[in-house]
Amino acid sequence: LKGIVDMYNLSGLSFREFLELETNQTFPVYSFADMVERHEEIVEDILKHVRPLAYFNNYLEYGYYPIYLEEKSHIDYLLKNINLTLEFDIPYASQIELKYLVKLKQLLYIAAKDNTCNVNISKLSGLIGVSRATVLNYLNYMKNARLLTLLYDTDNDDDCGKKPKKLYIHNPNLLNAVCLEDVDTTVLRKSFFLSQLCPMSRITYTERADFLVDGKYRIAV
């Protein structure tokens, strides 16, 4: 379909977009640099119009996907789409035999429940019973399917063969759906941070903080 179809990756709703839908107001877009350097001024202006924290937990639970406007049972919807992605999209795109689907599901669940977010390929290999190379492949399949976010120590686009330093569930709605009531709040906030910044910023691993943004800002969440 090259030359016939234009491909476009559409991210989920940002917290700003969610607030606009919920309040029927329009809020300005700020760059990350603006938020770091002018955060007090920005917060003061926003609080004149809305109290974001009143909407924050709802966003973490169901606000990333606009389907929440129509779908009342958002947990069921998210779990159904996770299963569709694992059982149909990834096998079709990556030629995985159906008998290995349980391994993909195990790996996603382990990733969601690991509050350290560290990547131990040997341990994961033993837990799901596949080779180290297969674990790396599975992680990249789920990254491409937007189920996981993988962090490397560089921002090289050709990192698919490298071991990631950290892994996170792609967004807080997915994390809440997989873990239900047993969600670590720190990991949830990190997943939120990545879901907001990854579409427009370069996020890499750093030993000196949780994230390195655009090679310049070290952020601890």
Question: Language-model segments: which ranges?
Answer:
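A short helix-turn-beta junction within AAA+ P-loop NTPase domains corresponding to the substrate/partner-engaging
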Residues: 2-16
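Secondary-structure boundary/capping positions in well-ordered alpha/beta enzyme cores
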Residues: 4, 131, 200-204
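Conserved catalytic core of Hanks-type protein kinase domains
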Residues: 12, 59, 196
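Short, charged, surface-exposed secondary-structure boundary motifs
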Residues: 17-21
